[in-house]
């Protein structure tokens, strides 16, 4: 089916699914008769039979048989093999009627009574919670629900029926309804409202809110699908999450009519004795985790669900079990109380994520199988974070973790052909998805040789040269970078304009040489249109000598300022170790929008001055993040520019800064490795979304990763406790006469150092030097931004200690750099805009700090990201406020020259048009 309905399992039937399966048994590669390998020797013993004779037989004896006897024996063998092949095909057909999506059964029901069709839709909707489009599996799941609790079965069935009827009434796509895609959210709504009800079973008044809440699911599904279809994404269980979260938040534990279960945050360190862990209960938690997808904690119910999954798809059953195991292990890794693990509450989100990535929306290969395991692990920790955050407002986590984690992994872009995401219109079940993938792959392989035929002879031109470079690049080392073709992408990862852009340009983020280098006098002379006098005199000779020496100085400076492109070009033929070292240094400096390895060295030096342990943790984060990007086949020019390293360095630094275990707690390096490995995935996913508006991702991957880690562990975690953060509960005692101006001035470099979590003024001063080497304009705006943050803090009576420690300046620093010449061309208008953005970021930082402290979380660089993105989305008719395309962003000085050259070309074209018009 070609309609783009977004959902966990699109109803689009692979019309050739059954034919493909049947073709496996009837294709020429499976011959029904064994051809005679020696037709010239009809009366002689076959060579293969010589080894089968007994040793007492004479080797020289020739076995002779009559021709009709041999023909009869051959015909008997053919008949026997034909009958065996027919039995095989019949068995395959019989199994095909019950497994997969039971397409034949749905076709048979088309002309039957509407009531029978509706029952089929409800059963499919029941199974669609687990990505199963099979009414037999739905029936078995109903049996499992009855084993758990008949009352829950009633409410769940009612939710499915009401949701499906509402979709019919709203005129939703009939094929989607027939596949149960408008029923599974209603099933979960009915079940979970009964599970979290504080009233006893068979509280019949509960059916009213179940009915109304389930009716909202098709509306939410259709609305979300309108948004997600832009990225060809399913809506998963987001309608259920939205509906149930709103219901539980609206009623709560103290509601008179519909009280819900009381959910409270953790307030003490759990008492865990590892010797008390019971292995049988851990093993039992595997089927229980599968059952918790439907809110069931009975292991027999979970076992019945696994049987239902196996009937439709053994691969789904396998990944469900694997996902449950991964969730269990993740819970043990962060010292979760055993009772929570035994009840499967850490596993159900992992079950769904592992199924979704492991063959459902990605074609199953060993690469996507590993990706499914990583997604399940990421989902487990995200669930812990969301659970702790939502417990503050008394709401359970639902399946938010599954939805968010899986969507992130589906937005991943990669150059690895083995990680193949299916179009939603082709998604059915893992086995059929793999057949579709192999069919597409074989078709592409068949077209590849024919594409170089003589019908389209190559023609000279730039496109041919680009194509030849792309072909040659496939045979080069992973670390080989063509620096002459690298284009600065300004912290945007992922494929711009998705597949179309990938096909047109295999390296969409090439790092192009800027129009001029910093302090390039040649270009300055050309842009100023300096005319040299032709007559030779002493004055002109002096001037030419000064110009020549200036050129030499400029050339020398260009080797260490700007982006140090010459360094990258010089390393392209060197050892991969040196190249990787260069990438790590650039990633370290990219936090401050600087693509310069020398600046990276100075920044690492400053980190060691601050705290060697923090420097070790930060460098490890950069290395792991960069390596992960290489493994995921991300764009190599982006890796070489450090775009996949800067989030990793921030993750490593801030996890060490907020650790309550002190310095040199070596076990902390394990979560640092895991969390920094997630940064390239988040960068790629966010880049896929933000490319629609030509926006950078900034430090959003770092913010998401560290916020989830701090929320998942918290202050009371046994293994990885974090710093306790509490909201303000009293008015601060501020005496304005006690303000110390020297400490306020010192807060300017400290605020710059706080970008990396450092409060040492010497470290901040070293960072300023690192910025000045690459770009004086970046250094200037960093100082201005820190100053604006300090002044904004004084205007709202912030305690002096917070100001002295630079906590009010680091977000303003980044915002001022981003707007003041980096993504907008520097003019006096954009300079004022940068100051305004710095002020906005400072006040937004205060707001977010107060809000996140309720959950025990720091604001990180959320204020910078949100304020800078807001200002980059600004539209204006003022030509002096010029936002650069991301493909042209390098550093402020080069950005300014690019803008002036564009303006000069534009004016020249206008003059030419005017002159042509005047002549005519």
Swiss-Prot record:
Entry annotated with the keyword Transmembrane: yes
Domain of life: Eukaryota
Biased composition (Low complexity): 26-39
A GO MF label: cell adhesion molecule binding
Keyword Glycoprotein attributed: yes
Residues recorded with modification Phosphoserine: 477
Record field: compositional bias (Basic and acidic residues): 47-57
InterPro entries (UniProt xref): Ammonium/urea_transptr, Urea_transporter
Family: Belongs to the urea transporter family.
Name of the molecule in the record: Urea transporter 2
Natural source organism: Homo sapiens (Human)
Phylogenetic placement of the source organism: Eukaryota, Metazoa, Chordata, Craniata, Vertebrata
GN (gene name): SLC14A2
């Amino acid at each position: 089916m070609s309609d783009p309905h977004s959902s966990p399992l699109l109803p689009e039937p692979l019309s050739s699914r059954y034919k493909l399966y049947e073709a496996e048994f009837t294709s020429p590669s499976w011959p029904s008769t064994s051809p005679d390998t020696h037709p010239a020797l009809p009366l002689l013993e076959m060579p293969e039979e010589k080894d089968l004779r007994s040793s007492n037989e004479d080797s020289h004896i020739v076995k002779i048989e009559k021709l009709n006897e041999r023909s009869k024996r051959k015909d008997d063998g053919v008949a026997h093999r034909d009958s065996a092949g027919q039995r095989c095909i019949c068995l395959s057909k019989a199994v095909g009627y019950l497994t997969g999506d039971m397409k034949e059964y749905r076709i048979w029901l088309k002309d039957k009574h509407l009531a029978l069709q509706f029952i089929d839709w409800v059963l499919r909707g029941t199974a669609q919670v687990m990505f199963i489009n099979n009414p037999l599996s739905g029936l078995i799941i109903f049996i499992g629900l009855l084993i758990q609790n008949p009352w829950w079965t009633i409410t769940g069935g009612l939710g499915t029926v009401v949701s499906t009827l509402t979709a019919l009434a709203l005129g939703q796509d009939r094929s989607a309804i027939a596949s149960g895609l408008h029923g599974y959210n209603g099933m979960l709504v009915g079940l979970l409202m009964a599970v979290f009800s504080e009233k006893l079973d068979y509280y019949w008044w509960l059916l009213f809110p179940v009915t109304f809440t389930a009716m909202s699911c098709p509306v939410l599904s259709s609305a979300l699908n309108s948004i997600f279809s832009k990225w060809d994404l399913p809506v998963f269980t987001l309608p259920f999450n939205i509906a149930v979260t709103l219901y539980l938040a609206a009623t709560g534990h103290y509601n008179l009519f519909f009280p819900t279960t009381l959910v409270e945050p953790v307030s003490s360190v759990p008492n865990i004795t590892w010797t008390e862990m019971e292995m049988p209960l851990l093993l039992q938690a595997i089927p229980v985790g599968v059952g918790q997808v439907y809110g069931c904690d009975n292991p027999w119910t979970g076992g019945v669900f696994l049987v239902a999954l196996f009937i439709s798809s053994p691969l789904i059953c396998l990944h469900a079990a694997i996902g449950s195991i991964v969730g269990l292990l993740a819970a043990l890794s962060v010292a979760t109380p055993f009772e929570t693990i035994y009840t499967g509450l850490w596993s159900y989100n992992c079950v769904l994520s592992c199924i979704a990535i492991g063959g459902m929306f990605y074609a199953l290969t060993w690469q996507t199988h590993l990706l499914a395991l990583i997604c399940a692990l990421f989902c487990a920790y995200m669930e812990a974070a969301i659970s702790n955050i939502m417990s503050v407002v008394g709401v359970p986590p639902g399946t938010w973790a599954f939805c968010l984690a899986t969507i992130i992994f589906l937005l991943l872009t990669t150059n690895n052909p083995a990680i193949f995401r299916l179009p939603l219109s082709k998604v059915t079940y893992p086995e059929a998805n793999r057949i579709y993938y192999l069919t597409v792959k074989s078709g592409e392989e068949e077209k590849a040789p024919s594409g170089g035929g003589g019908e389209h002879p190559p023609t000279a031109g730039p496109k041919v040269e680009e194509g030849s470079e792309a072909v040659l690049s496939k045979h080069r080392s992973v670390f080989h970078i063509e620096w002459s073709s690298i284009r600065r992408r300004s912290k945007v990862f992922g494929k711009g304009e998705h597949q179309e852009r990938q096909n047109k340009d295999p390296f969409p983020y090439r790092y192009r040489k800027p129009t001029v280098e910093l302090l390039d006098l040649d270009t300055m002379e050309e842009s100023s249109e300096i005319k040299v006098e032709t007559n030779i005199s002493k004055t002109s000779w002096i001037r030419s000598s000064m110009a020549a020496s200036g050129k030499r100085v400029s050339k020398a400076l260009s080797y260490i300022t700007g982006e140090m492109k010459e360094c990258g070009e010089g390393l392209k033929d060197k050892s991969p170790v040196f190249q990787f070292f260069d990438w790590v240094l650039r990633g370290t400096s990219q936090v401050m929008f600087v693509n310069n390895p020398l600046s990276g060295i100075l920044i690492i030096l400053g980190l060691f001055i601050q705290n060697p342990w923090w420097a070790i943790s930060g460098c490890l984060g950069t290395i792991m993040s960069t390596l992960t990007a290489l493994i995921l086949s991300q764009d190599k020019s982006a890796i070489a520019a450090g775009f996949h390293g800067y989030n990793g360095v921030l993750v490593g630094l801030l996890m060490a800064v907020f650790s309550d275990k002190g310095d040199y707690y070596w076990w902390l390096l394990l979560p640092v490795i895991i969390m920094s490995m997630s940064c390239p995935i988040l960068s790629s996913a966010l880049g896929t979304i933000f490319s629609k508006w030509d926006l950078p991702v900034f430090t959003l991957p770092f913010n998401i990763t560290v916020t989830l880690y701090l929320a998942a562990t918290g202050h009371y975690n046994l293994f990885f406790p974090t710093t306790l953060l509490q909201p303000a509960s009293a008015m601060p005692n501020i005496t304005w006469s006690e303000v110390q101006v020297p400490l306020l001035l010192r807060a300017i470099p400290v605020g710059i150092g706080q970008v990396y979590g450092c409060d040492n003024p010497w470290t901040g001063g070293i960072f300023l030097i690192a910025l000045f080497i690459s770009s004086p304009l970046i250094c200037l705006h960093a100082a201005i931004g820190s100053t604006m943050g300090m002044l904004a803090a004084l205007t709202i009576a912030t305690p002096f200690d917070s100001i002295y420690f630079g906590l009010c300046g680091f977000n303003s620093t980044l915002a001022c750099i981003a707007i003041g010449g980096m993504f907008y061309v520097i003019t006096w208008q954009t300079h004022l805009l940068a100051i305004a953005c710095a002020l906005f970021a400072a006040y937004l930082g205060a707001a977010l700090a107060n809000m996140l402290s309720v959950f025990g979380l720091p604001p990180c660089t959320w204020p910078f990201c949100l304020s800078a993105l807001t200002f980059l989305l600004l539209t204006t008719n003022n030509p002096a406020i010029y936002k650069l395309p991301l493909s042209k962003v390098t550093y402020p000085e080069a950005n300014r020259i690019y803008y002036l050259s564009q303006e000069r070309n534009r004016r020249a074209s206008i003059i030419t048009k005017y002159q042509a018009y005047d002549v005519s």
